[in-house]
């Protein structure tokens, strides 16, 4: 049994009848911050709660137990959690609400102090999710921060009615970038058994899922920690041959994005030609301070290999602006790399100091106004390239997975195999599913199209870019 750290609860455990509903099921509500890994973990614990007889509800007001899945990668989601816990504590004092906290922030001293301050009853680190049944039987506050070996063994049931789903294949990270807290919060890399991965995907396929995304902090390292496991390239081929129409993966590391992975993508039609390859900076000096383990030339060589084998590949990246010590010259090197690659999409952030990381301990942060000004320039660069790339799709026919209503009136939204958001008239795609769509118009952020063979819709004014 993993160690736990007991404190007295404000009421007599979780086994009693819900307040005001004698004999009724206990009700839980889950709030998720952060990445797709957190979304997957929330689905995992949600299915676990249902199997234990709990009812999932859509709001804090309906719930007896609110579980907050936290993110610690940047400061903003941490502050959101702090604010939310303050609100939940008031509900706890008013009506005996139980509060749970999980995810990366829960693994850190900062999160544990927050949990004690705001009266959190259950605190589970990312490696202790399978302790939830034990926690729910407790009559004491339950904290578990261990990395349990069985956390990768659980296969959650397919999400009801979902056409796309995530599947975790590896947890943790063996890289130690100076800005990143993930190796601390999620531990070293541990690959999931391939039989469990394939079984989960088969269940998703039987449930009607047509798109699966393989998840990990560094999916490219899959299998390296377990003798006898397939490599990531081999796993891609296995999953790509299962009959799922669309297979994606997140996230990659340039050091581990090897030629055999590129070959597997090129030779397996089911694998989408969307590659997210975080560069973080175009400056070798900054990459060295980040401890990214590669340099600009290596990254560009990987891009060249990808373009050579996959000329239709859609490329996206992550970039951190204003890392400690970044000069204007360093930033110009990032802008020039952006031009050299010509990304379709990018996720850009100003550097956020995270306590417990080497960068936080050893480097002095830049003034916020410098970071924000550089970010604005990079965003303009990104919009310019995204628009240029999106225009290349006008007149082409693409496969779009329509998910549901768009914010724009009269349209439904989906995404193509290159992960572009695509809007089509709602009358042409009345139900979610896969459609062949001819792209008619592009903006920097969206593609607009019409379903091939569908009756021409009444004119709908397209949103202004």
UniProtKB/Swiss-Prot annotation:
Residues 159-388 form the Radical SAM core domain. GO terms for molecular function: 4 iron, 4 sulfur cluster binding; metal ion binding; N6-isopentenyladenosine methylthiotransferase activity. Its main location: cytoplasm. [4Fe-4S] cluster 2 binds at residues 173, 177, 180. Keywords: 4Fe-4S, Cytoplasm, Iron, Iron-sulfur, Metal-binding, S-adenosyl-L-methionine, Transferase, tRNA processing. Belongs to the methylthiotransferase family. MiaB subfamily. Binds 2 [4Fe-4S] clusters. One cluster is coordinated with 3 cysteines and an exchangeable S-adenosyl-L-methionine. The keyword Metal-binding applies. Catalyzes the methylthiolation of N6-(dimethylallyl)adenosine (i(6)A), leading to the formation of 2-methylthio-N6-(dimethylallyl)adenosine (ms(2)i(6)A) at position 37 in tRNAs that read codons beginning with uridine. Its cofactor is [4Fe-4S] cluster. Residues 26-141 form the MTTase N-terminal domain. Monomer. InterPro entries: Elp3/MiaA/NifB-like_rSAM, Methylthiotransferase, Methylthiotransferase_CS, Methylthiotransferase_N, Methylthiotransferase_N_sf, MiaB_methiolase, rSAM, rSAM_horseshoe. It catalyses: N(6)-dimethylallyladenosine(37) in tRNA + (sulfur carrier)-SH + AH2 + 2 S-adenosyl-L-methionine = 2-methylsulfanyl-N(6)-dimethylallyladenosine(37) in tRNA + (sulfur carrier)-H + 5'-deoxyadenosine + L-methionine + A + S-adenosyl-L-homocysteine + 2 H(+). This is tRNA-2-methylthio-N(6)-dimethylallyladenosine synthase. GO terms for cellular component: cytosol. [4Fe-4S] cluster 1 binds at residues 35, 71, 104. Residues 391-453 form the TRAM domain. It is found in: Cytoplasm. It comes from the Bacteria. It holds the Pfam family UPF0004. It comes from Thermus thermophilus (strain ATCC BAA-163 / DSM 7039 / HB27). CDD domains: Radical_SAM.
């Amino acid at each position: 049994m993993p160690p736990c750290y007991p404190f007295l609860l404000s009421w007599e455990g979780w086994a009693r009848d819900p307040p005001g509903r004698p004999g009724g099921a206990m009700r839980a509500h889950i709030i998720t911050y952060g990445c797709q890994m957190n979304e997957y973990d929330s689905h995992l614990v949600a299915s676990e709660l249902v199997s234990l007889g709990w009812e999932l509800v859509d709001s804090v007001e309906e719930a007896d137990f609110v579980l907050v899945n936290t993110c610690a990668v940047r400061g903003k989601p941490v502050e959101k959690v702090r604010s939310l816990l303050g609100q939940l504590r008031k509900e706890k004092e008013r009506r005996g609400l139980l509060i749970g906290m999980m995810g990366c922030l829960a693994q850190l001293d900062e999160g544990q102090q927050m949990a004690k301050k705001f009266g959190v009853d259950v605190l589970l680190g990312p490696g202790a999710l399978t302790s939830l049944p034990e926690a729910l039987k407790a009559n004491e506050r339950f904290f578990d921060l261990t990395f349990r070996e069985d956390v990768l063994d659980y296969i959650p049931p397919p999400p009801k009615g979902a056409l796309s789903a995530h599947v975790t294949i590896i947890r943790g990270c063996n890289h130690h970038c100076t800005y990143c807290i993930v190796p601390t919060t999620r531990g070293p890399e541990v690959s999931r058994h391939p039989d469990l991965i394939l079984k989960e995907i088969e269940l998703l396929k039987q449930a009607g899922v047509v798109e699966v995304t393989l998840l990990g902090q560094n999916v490219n390292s899959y299998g390296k920690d377990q003798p006898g496991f397939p490599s990531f390239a081999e796993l891609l081929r296995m999953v790509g041959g299962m009959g799922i129409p669309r297979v994606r993966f997140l996230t990659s590391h340039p050091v581990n994005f090897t030629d055999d992975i590129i070959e597997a993508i090129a030779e397996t039609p089911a694998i989408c030609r969307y590659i997210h390859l975080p560069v973080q900076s175009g400056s070798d000096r900054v990459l060295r301070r980040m401890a990214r383990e590669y340099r600009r030339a290596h990254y560009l060589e990987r891009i060249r290999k990808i373009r050579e084998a996959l000329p239709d590949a859609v490329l996206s990246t992550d970039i951190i602006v204003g890392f400690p010590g970044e000069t204007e010259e360093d930033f110009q090197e990032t802008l020039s790399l952006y031009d050299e690659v010509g990304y379709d999409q990018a996720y850009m952030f100003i550097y956020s100091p995270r306590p417990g990381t080497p960068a936080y301990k050893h480097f002095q942060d830049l003034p916020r106004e410098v970071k924000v000004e550089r970010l604005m320039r990079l965003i303009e660069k990104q919009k310019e390239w995204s628009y240029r790339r999106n225009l290349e799709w006008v007149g082409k026919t693409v496969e779009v997975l329509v998910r549901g209503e768009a914010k724009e009136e009269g349209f439904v939204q989906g995404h193509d195999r290159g992960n572009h958001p695509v809007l089509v008239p709602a009358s042409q795609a009345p139900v979610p599913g896969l459609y062949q769509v001819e792209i008619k118009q592009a903006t920097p952020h969206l593609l607009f199209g019409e379903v091939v063979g569908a009756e021409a819709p009444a004119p709908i004014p397209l949103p202004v870019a």
